[in-house]
């Protein structure tokens, strides 16, 4: 693909090296705070490196309240970016499931479900019948329980 001729400024208040999720987020949030003299440098194409290879999952539940609140903010931000920027983000809230194949893992998922309630994240422990309704064709043999977080993206 031919590269367009781009003239870079000789100086800027902020120069960000790397156009992955972190670099793009920093540039976005700086401009939201009124710092508009921002240059974002990426050697190829935005989000074409490590960010491009990531699964793109956005989980609502994390081990601390701070990380969980950050995840909630990210969900709200991703949901609004397309309307704000006119750029398709591909963000969808499709939910997530964590499966238990033994009692130890089931107890862990039950603790996570309790923690989710404390952090204000909607979650539920579901049985195999409900799991099959959500994911037709899934093999539930050996699954003793499932944590379902509907609003994960």
Language-model features, listed with the residues they occupy:
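Dinucleotide-binding Rossmann-like beta1-alpha1 core, especially the glycine-rich loop
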Residues: 56-134
């Amino acid at each position: 693909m031919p590269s367009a001729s781009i003239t870079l400024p000789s100086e800027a208040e902020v120069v960000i090296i790397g156009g992955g999720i972190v670099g793009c987020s920093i540039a976005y949030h700086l401009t939201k705070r009124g710092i508009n003299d921002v240059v974002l440098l990426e050697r190829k194409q935005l989000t074409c490196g490590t960010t491009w290879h990531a699964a793109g999952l956005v989980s609502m539940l994390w081990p601390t309240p701070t990380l969980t609140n950050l995840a909630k903010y990210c969900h709200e931000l991703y949901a609004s970016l397309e309307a704000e920027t006119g750029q398709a983000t591909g963000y969808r809230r499709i939910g997530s499931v964590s499966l238990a194949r033994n009692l130890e893992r089931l107890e862990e998922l039950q603790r996570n479900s309790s923690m989710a309630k404390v952090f204000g994240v909607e979650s539920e422990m579901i049985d195999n019948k409900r799991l099959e309704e959500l994911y037709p064709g899934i093999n539930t043999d050996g699954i003793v329980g499932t944590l379902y977080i509907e609003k994960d993206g």
